[in-house]
Each structure stands twice: as C-alpha cells, then as structure tokens.
Amino acid sequence: MSIITDIYAREVLDSRGNPTLEVEVYTEDGAFGRGMVPSGASTGEHEAVELRDGDKSRYNGLGTQKAVDNVNNIIAEAIIGYEVTDQQAIDRAMIALDGTENKGKLGANAILGVSIAAARAAADELGVPLYNYLGGFNAKVLPTPMMNIINGGSHSDAPIAFQEFMIVPVGAPTFKEALRWGAEIFHALKKILKARGLETAVGDEGGFAPKFDGTEDGVETILKAIEAAGYKAGEDGVMIGFDCASSEFYENGVYDYTKFEGEGGKKLSASEQVDYLEELVSKYPIITIEDGMDENDWDGWKILTERLGKKVQLVGDDFFVTNTKYLERGIRENASNAILIKVNQIGTLTETFEAIEMAKEAGFTAIVSHRSGETEDSTISDIAVATNAGQIKTGSLSRTDRMAKYNQLLRIEDQLAEVAQYKGLKAFYNLKK
C-alpha cells in the first residue's frame, strides 16, 4: 500500500457563491483524491463547527482561509505519512488533533475535506470506484430519492414555513426510472405554476419557490403535477415528503408559522403541532416528515413518534446532527424512527458511517443528504450506495450542484448492472406495513 505524501487545501466557492474548502491528497504511488465541503443554511445548534474567518471586509465574514490554513499547516503535518487506505486512523488522528467535542479548533470543514480527499485517493490507489472502496462488493442498493421540488422556509422567499416539499418515486422499478419520473413531474409542476401566474425561479436546492396560499396549496399543486406527468400518487407511484425544519420557527414553546407566513400563519403548541402533522398525513399520501418538531423538543418528538411512527418516516436532522450521542438517546427514548446523514454535521467519514450503522442496527432508516450550499462533489452518492442506505436527499431536478449527485448515481447503476437494486417503498423498512 501507499502512504500520503502531500495534502493541500484551497478556498473555492459553493453553489451560493460563498467560500468553502477543496482539499487534495496525494500518495507516494501517484494516487490522488479531491474533496469539497458543503454548507448548510438552516443548521442544528449541535452541529460540528464550520470554521469561518469572520473578517467582514472579505466575503462578508464567510471566508474559510483559517480552515484552509489549518489543513495546510497543521493537519497536513500530522497526516502525511499515514497509509492512505487506513481511513479510520486518519479520521481518528484529526479528531484527536482538534481535541474538542465539536471540532471547533480546526473546523469540521477542514477535517471533512481531508477525510473525503483521503478516501478518494485510497480508491484511486486501489483502482476501484469510491462506493466500492467504502462499501466493498456488497455495495449494491441505489437509493430511493427524495426530491425537493418546492422550497420554502429558510431556503427561499416563499411565504411557507415548511422548508421542503418533496416527491418520492417509491413505485419506480429502477433508479434511472425514478429520476425520470421526478424530472417529468418537476417540468409538469413548472407548467402548472406558470399557468397560475406564479414564480418559477428556483431556490437554493433547485426547487420552485412560488407564493402559495399555504402548505396545503403546495401539496395540492404537487399532486396535480404528479397526475399531469402521467403518474399516480400513493404507495405504487409517487409519495410526498416534508422537511418542516421546525427549529426555524419554534420559539419559547410555540411553533410560530407567522415567522414565514405572516399574519395568516398559525401559532401552535407542541401537541397542536403533532395534531397538525397528523391531519396532513391523514389527508395526503405522505411517507416522510423531517424535523417535524424542534431539535430540543424531546417530549414533542416522543408524542409525534407515538402517534405517527408506524405510518410515516420521522426523520431527525437538526434533532440528531449525524451524531451517535443524540441518535442513541433517540433510539432509547423512541423519539423519531430515522436519521438524516449529513457528512459536514459530524466532520469525518468514519463518524458518518458509525451513525448509519447505529441507525440500521436499531431499525431506523438512514437518509444520506446534501446541504443547501453544495458543490460539484458527488461523494454523498457513493456513500449512499456504499452503505446500502436505501435513501438519498439531494435536491430538485435542476442546478448542476444537485444533478451532479443524480448523474453519479446513474453511473453507479450502470456499473453495477444486474447487481444493482432499487428498493423503492421497501427502503422505508422502519414503517410497519
């Protein structure tokens, strides 16, 4: 095997025009890997620290030169000489070098860039695809996509509190067909919005951000788009998902929809929030709800799980922040039944894989996810297949930063050929159907 001989980081821009890191790792045998780091807009308060410069005269304070310097001057010195295929040793060494619980010293963005680049260099060293290197020859499940075709909340200027309205093509026979279904529904939706005189500009994740009359108007319009594209809503066709991102409009025990929806918005207690979500589930073909309760509302999460946990996938994003400490508590207290996996919430591939493994062992599903600030890096596609996670959330059917992930999955499906599996509805193994 081959040792790491050089590590180099630079500042590049993400899909929102904000700085992020790109890291390159080189080995003595000439292998090479590059990793780029995403960034979130709505972030959980317990996430690992994304190190920013804070210099308002440069990139409005969002520069990442400190993190770049930490890679080039501190991490590189510690990691050069490591065997490139010893991912756990590399990641553990960086965690120890940082020495904080939340990676606040070196920055999770600095550490993650090296973690991804090292894995890619190792795959290059061995001459195998990244998903194969990370998951071995059992990596074969193409994920069911959750496609965010309507953006609300902090991801757009649309007056809707829920951050994402997603379509989930559970009835498609292959990933390739699932992607086609999604694209056709996306374009059907655009025609419907235009016919209503609504805005068809897209938000951060490639979905539309029209001024709907509320949540139900958004869902009804998506259902019309599904039908207009020639598909049907339901378990043998296309289902609906929400990312409520409730922490963005929760304050002092109140779920305050007026923050995004104005005077017409609701103000709900935790129990009323559960009632509202249950009402939506009874009315529409909803299969997944992410962050339906605030990240610190553990009692609310337990009530929600008791009421809906056998019918709907209840995903903890801000709630768990890809951290096994919070996930373990959620499993123990029966709060949610799924975890969203975001590599930059925790900061290394090793810890990411540990969270996925813990979830699966508990019967929780794990959904590999992008961030709203993305790059052309498609590592999450390989992670989804490597872990046989079965689900991915990587945006709408527009914007190259989103399509890069879908296109990589098409390549992987082609490479796997007859071995490839698309689970569709069966990817939601946490539901008692």
Curated annotation (Swiss-Prot):
Primary localisation category: cytoplasm
Pathway assigned to this chain's UniProt record: Carbohydrate degradation; glycolysis; pyruvate from D-glyceraldehyde 3-phosphate: step 4/5
One GO cellular component term noted in the UniProt record for this chain: extracellular region
Signal peptide: none
Keywords: Cytoplasm, Glycolysis, Lyase, Magnesium, Metal-binding, Secreted
InterPro entries: Enolase, Enolase-like_C_sf, Enolase-like_N, Enolase_C, Enolase_CS, Enolase_N
SUPFAM superfamilies: Enolase C-terminal domain-like, Enolase N-terminal domain-like
Residues annotated as binding (2R)-2-phosphoglycerate: Q163, K342, R371, S372, K393
Pfam families reported in the protein's UniProt record: Enolase_C (PF00113), Enolase_N (PF03952)
Stored HAMAP family: Enolase
Sequence similarity: Belongs to the enolase family.
NCBIfam families, per the entry: eno (TIGR01060)
Name the UniProt record assigns to this protein: Enolase 1
